[in-house]
Amino acid sequence: MTIKNPLPTLLFFLAPTFLMAQGKGIAPADLLKPLRDSWPTYNGDYTGRRYSALTQVNQSNVQHLTLAWMTRVTPGAGSGGGRGGGGFGGASNIIVGGEGPGDIAVGGGTIKASVLQVDGTLYFTMPDNAWAVDARDGRELWHYFWKTKGGTHIGNRGLAMWNNYLYMETPDNYLVSLDARTGKERWHKVIADLSQGYFSTPAPIVVGNHVLVGTGNDIDAPGFLQSFDPETGELQWKLYTVPMKAGDPGLETWASLDAARHGGGQTWIPGAYDPETKLYIFGTGNPTPAYTTGTRGDGDNLFTCALVAVNVDTGKMAWHFSTSPHDMHDYDSAQTPVLVDAMFNGKMRKLVLTAARNGYYFTLDRVTGERLVSAKYGLTTNWAKGLNKSGAPEHDPGKDATVAGSLVSPNSDGTTNWEPPAFSPDTGFFYVAEGNAYSIFYLTDVDPRGSMGLGGKEEVGVGTAGSYLSAIDYQTGKVAWRRPYYGNGGGGGLLTTAGKLLFAGDGAGNLVAHDSATGKPLWHTRIGGITNAPQTYMLDGRQYLIAATGDTIWAFVMY
């Protein structure tokens, strides 16, 4: 269903159509340009800053933002698929692919994807589904449906683009390439073993002639990052995030090789790329089992819960930094890092910034991995007893899960989670959604099926000290200001612009524009809970602001 608002007082429906997406696509070199009229990759550009140079919408006029259109999509393949027919306003032809039988019914979809905008077309996903819609009015141009073999349908975070080709991952672990103009499939390749519990949720990232692909898993299986040829889909290299053979670096931090080979460290969120060093920097997930040292020992369990830099041409690790050595609370460090070139101690430095799920913030030199700043940003974070000699937090054994229970903050959802942070070069602030919930962690398991790769744990939430939109000074790690989120919890990821604006959701379902220097709210509209982050682009001389909630994309402009 599509609703368009050509004037503030006029709404009308668009009839079903089948159209072709127009345009020349995105050349790999174009991904290196500053972010303005398009949004060609997961975070807009390779830096992860989610900062747009657009200024048409700014502090002086943001209150005039008005709904331009909204479009609601329906996943599945109509009567032949597993999830019902297409919605009003949908394309009349649905392209169907996949290796599954076509009759596996899975849960309804939510748009957790970052939406690409190239040549006036928006591209986005749900699990097993991809769409192209007109960026001017939300009309559906094509819809691709993947017949799944099964797997965990927890979400899909979007597409990558290379020339006129798109790439998506599926819950049953295929990398699928589509023609961006028609939605027709070019090829698909297996990227992980479904029988081993893997499921794939990230958006791929295209870097030159590499399609970088991560995966997820919640049982005792090793994490890895892979690179595929964008033309043929052939595997170029594979980097494991845990030691896999005798002599591998980091093996000494595990109880045994067998423990390391089943040690987790999944790669389920896209990273950031520095074209000058050819380093792709990404975060890794928790070790497994997550809540007990029974098999993994008392070491740091490298390279889980870490920032890792890999050379995209060779697939070799350049450096790593553990943000949660020997994690005991499922504090994945998979959050997208942010790359900035900025002053630090009077010198221009190439930096990487991250606010980890564990409640700690870090600034590192992204060329060498040298740790420059470590600071606690969570108001209630209590699981660590201080910093170790490398500047990483040292876990407090007294906060490990016990039979009697341990009161820990943050809970396993973290002080922040996967939703994207942002950075503004105008303010020097790193922005992040901050939650301060408490749980009691019990070393027990009341579910007879077990608890996946968690190692036996029951978690009981016992309240929160509040959720905030927080601004962190990257040079000190200190929180410059906090704005409370209204409603229940946080509100998705973030967007900053040269119009001195910071866009965010809140826990009450509002999309809010803030003063990026102070956090003061300047405008809001209620659209529901934002599932990824707001985005912006310029088209036909007008700046659009878009956000996804549930199965709907909303677009705003100034009238």
Pin down the residues of each PLM region.
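N-terminal secretory signal peptides that target proteins for export/translocation
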Residues: 1-4
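Mature N-terminal segment immediately following signal peptide/propeptide cleavage
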Residues: 23-78, 114-117, 139
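Short Gly/aromatic-enriched secondary-structure transition segments
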Residues: 52-58, 84-91, 446-448
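Disordered, low-complexity segments in secreted/periplasmic proteins that are enriched in proline
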Residues: 78-107
